């Protein structure tokens, strides 16, 4: 390698589903590097053998790619054996094209790590990783529930049962009771009045007309399974939420600080989602800009030959950004927080809604970083600081007259005639 060697003893791992290719690079005082290669199984026994092999060569620095979920058990075993693991995105350790093998990939990762050319990924503590896994699984359950509700809605639409026209929520108490009655007695006409709650604003006559449809046997079977699956998913989601609240109890003080930010005090799970993604220790992000960049809420740098190819935000934070956007969309509609609404309107007028919303997300992330760094509650003063006023500008008489002309003003002398200014800085036509 022609680059400067920063680590004299390190290891590169090429992790696969069944096998792990390892390569240790040992550099002596004369800058000569000797490589040791080995192949290990991804079973627990093979991971323990990997730890023993690393200790044999006194290697405590390991670098590997984040390949799917296969890196997680390897990381856990190495971390328990006091081995420092650097996890990197595959795009930062991409090998040269041609003549590629797994052993050469491990050696390439070792060489990059040896020369300090690997960009490490953010790995939160173990308890935060467990919390993140449950929070993301809850999000998947929510998506599954939404999908099943759409299928149930389609069954009612195909059968010409217009419950969505008379109820705001077809899965509410009254609508669900009517749906169950239809499934128990398909094709029969019944009175809907006993199933409608007294607080329902829709007249009984309209509801009776909305259920004047016929559901087929096939659609009834499908609708029954959809409703049953929705109930099961809701039960699983409630159990996951109980476990999420249990795991987040030790971070209650941090969550209270996050909930002082506008938009995070309505739903207690919103603050937990933020905690599960970024953790409670902000020392891993030197500045608020680093956190914003990690979350994918800032423009990219993609420039070549003085041409800017793209300034779009990155695809990072696929689970984190939707939460921030949801909070930002709620904040811009509130009149209680002018620090957000004023900035949103100013940017929207120039750049549009989408870019303005991402700017509000950046403001929220900046506030989160400062709150968790200083351990102080949110205050809007930081965003409401007055901008520095420009110094007095000096204009010549012709410049001042030209400016007044552009604004459409008419200059009238106190004693002289009236001058109309339209085409030039100095008056020509006087009357």
Identify the residue ranges that each predicted region occupies.
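Short, solvent-exposed helix-loop connector elements
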Residues: 119-136, 163-166, 218-221, 305-313, ...
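Single conserved hydrophobic/aromatic residue that forms the stacking wall/gate
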Residues: 422-431
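Phosphate- and other anionic-substrate recognition elements at nucleic-acid/protein interfaces
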Residues: 1-209
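Acidic, Ser/Thr-rich low-complexity intrinsically disordered segments
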Residues: 400-421
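Phosphate-backbone recognition surface of nucleic-acid-processing proteins
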Residues: 97, 256-260, 272-354
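Helix-hairpin-helix/helix-loop-helix acidic hairpins
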Residues: 208-269
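Basic, amphipathic alpha-helical segments enriched in Lys/Arg and hydrophobic/aromatic residues
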Residues: 348-403
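Short helix-capping/linker segments at secondary-structure and domain boundaries
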Residues: 117-119, 148, 185-188, 237-241, ...
């Amino acid at each position: 390698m022609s680059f400067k060697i920063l680590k004299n003893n390190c290891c590169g791992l090429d992790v696969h589903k069944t096998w792990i290719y390892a390569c240790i690079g040992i550099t002596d005082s004369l800058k000569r590097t000797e490589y040791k290669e080995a192949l290990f199984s991804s079973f627990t026994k093979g991971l323990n053998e990997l730890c023993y092999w690393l200790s044999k060569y006194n290697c405590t620095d390991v670098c590997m790619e984040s390949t799917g979920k296969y890196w997680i058990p390897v990381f856990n075993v190495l971390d328990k054996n006091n081995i420092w693991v650097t996890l990197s995105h595959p795009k930062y350790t991409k090998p040269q094209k041609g003549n590629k093998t797994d052993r050469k990939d491990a050696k390439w990762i070792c060489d990059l790590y040896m020369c300090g050319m690997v960009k490490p990924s953010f790995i939160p503590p173990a308890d935060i990783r467990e919390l993140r896994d449950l929070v993301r699984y809850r999000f998947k359950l929510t998506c599954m529930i939404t999908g099943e509700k759409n299928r149930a809605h389609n069954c009612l639409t195909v059968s010409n049962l217009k419950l969505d026209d008379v109820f705001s929520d077809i899965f509410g108490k009254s609508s669900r009771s009517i749906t169950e009655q239809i499934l128990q007695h398909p094709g029969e006409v019944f009175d809907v009045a006993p199933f409608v709650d007294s607080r329902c604003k829709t007249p009984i006559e309209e509801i009776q007309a909305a259920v004047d449809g016929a559901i087929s046997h096939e659609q009834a079977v499908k609708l029954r399974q959809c409703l049953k699956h929705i109930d099961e998913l809701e039960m699983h989601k409630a159990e996951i939420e109980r476990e999420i609240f249990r795991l987040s109890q030790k971070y209650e003080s941090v969550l209270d600080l996050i909930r002082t930010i506008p938009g995070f005090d309505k739903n207690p799970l919103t603050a937990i989602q933020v905690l599960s993604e970024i953790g409670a220790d902000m020392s891993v992000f030197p500045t608020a800009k680093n956190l914003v960049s990690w979350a994918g809420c800032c423009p990219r740098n993609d420039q070549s030959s003085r041409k800017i190819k793209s300034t779009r935000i990155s695809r990072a934070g696929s689970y984190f950004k939707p939460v921030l956007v949801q909070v930002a969309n709620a904040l811009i509609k509130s009149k209680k927080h002018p620090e957000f609404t004023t900035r949103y309107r100013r940017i929207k007028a120039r750049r549009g809604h989408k870019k303005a919303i991402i700017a509000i997300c950046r403001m929220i992330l900046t506030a989160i970083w400062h709150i968790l760094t200083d351990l102080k509650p949110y205050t809007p003063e930081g965003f409401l600081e007055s901008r520095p006023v420009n110094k007095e500008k000096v204009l010549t008489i012709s410049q001042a007259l030209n400016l007044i002309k552009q604004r459409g003003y008419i200059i009238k002398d106190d004693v002289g005639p009236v001058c109309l200014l339209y085409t030039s800085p100095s008056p020509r036509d006087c009357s």
